[in-house]
Amino acid sequence: MYRLLSLFVLVLPLGCGSSGIPVAKVSGRITYLGLPVANASVSFVPDKIGTIPALGKTDADGRYTLNTYGASDGAPVGWCRVAISLTGPPPPLPEHLAKAEAAAETMQMPGKPLIPKKYFSAETSKLKVEVKSGSNEFDFALEGDLKP
């Protein structure tokens, strides 16, 4: 009985994050109008309340790998809503503000959206996936009327 309990204690943490919520490897590719989306932020927001989202960033080819508790550990297992955001560089500050470096850093406005803003929020993107145990590959082909 002691051996069985010891085995259970050793196996239980496998595939779980530091909070005990299981995570699974997640990667994929994001394109917009058929072109790779580089430098986009990717978030998987779990439907399960109290579960932290998984985050990632796309490379030059639009590929991403998600992190929840550690590097490339994946996303929480279960249904997740997806948000993808990408903006251009922030607009220049007016000269009178740019002189004060501290003010310039704290007052930077976000840049122009480079993909449709509906994808910026997990509530409005309409992208939803089920993360399952093991490895998961989710590609997203985004559509819209913004020119790439």
Name the predicted role of every residue range.
Residues 16-148:
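Beta-strand-dominated extracellular/periplasmic modules and repeats
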Residues 1-14:
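Sec-dependent bacterial lipoprotein signal peptides
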